[in-house]
């Protein structure tokens, strides 16, 4: 397994729309494993393949406290959503920045697991929010897209400054 490089804004590759996975095979399983390793190394709770410059419809999530409840979503489809909620969200591609984002309270999705088996899942709370956040990545959407242009600009400037400082270190 390997830790992959996470893209940061304003990298335009984050805006690419991911293509469906045609076959869940050993290569896709390796990507899933590398994505989990990357997500845990970065202390995230979710990661979309587009964030690591792999433009396929793959998401990994683990919102558990013990980091032992892995969820793999390959080619996820949103079937239903209901209610309204929102929390301050963060993103590995937008380091050290958070903002309140409106989301559905509950979602029902269909996806393939790591072995290519189809399943449906109903989620609420943090898991539902995380699923929506990561599914946005697959269509090139970031949480800052829900914010005003001024807030977007401020966050971009902060991330660019942080990346410059980290490049010097």
Swiss-Prot record:
Its EC number is 3.5.1.88. It comes from the Bacteria. Fe cation binds at residues 91, 133, 137. Its cofactor is Fe(2+). Binds 1 Fe(2+) ion. One of its GO terms (biological process) is co-translational protein modification. The active site is at residue 134. The keyword Oxidoreductase does not apply. Gene3D superfamilies: Peptide deformylase (3.90.45.10). InterPro entries: Peptide_deformylase, Peptide_deformylase_sf. Signal peptide: none annotated. Keywords: Hydrolase, Iron, Metal-binding, Protein biosynthesis. It catalyses: N-terminal N-formyl-L-methionyl-[peptide] + H2O = N-terminal L-methionyl-[peptide] + formate. GO terms for molecular function: metal ion binding; peptide deformylase activity. PANTHER family: PEPTIDE DEFORMYLASE (PTHR10458:SF21). Belongs to the polypeptide deformylase family. This is Peptide deformylase. It comes from Citrobacter koseri (strain ATCC BAA-895 / CDC 4225-83 / SGSC4696).
């Amino acid at each position: 397994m390997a830790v992959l490089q996470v893209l940061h804004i304003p990298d335009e590759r984050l805006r690419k729309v991911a293509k469906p996975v045609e076959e869940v095979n050993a290569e896709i399983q390796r990507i899933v494993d590398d994505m989990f390793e990357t997500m845990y190394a970065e202390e995230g709770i979710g990661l979309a393949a587009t964030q690591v410059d792999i433009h396929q419809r793959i998401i990994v999530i683990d919102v558990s406290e013990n980091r032992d409840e892995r969820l793999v979503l390959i080619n996820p489809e949103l079937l239903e959503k209901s209610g309204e909620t929102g929390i301050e969200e963060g993103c590995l591609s937008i380091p050290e920045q958070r903002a309140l984002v409106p989301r559905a309270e509950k979602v029902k999705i269909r996806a393939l697991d790591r072995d290519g088996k189809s399943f449906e899942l109903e989620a609420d709370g943090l898991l539902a929010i995380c699923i929506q956040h990561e599914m946005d990545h697959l269509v090139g959407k970031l949480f800052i897209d829900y914010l005003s242009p001024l807030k977007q600009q401020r966050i971009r400037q902060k991330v660019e400054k942080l990346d410059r400082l980290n490049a010097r270190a």
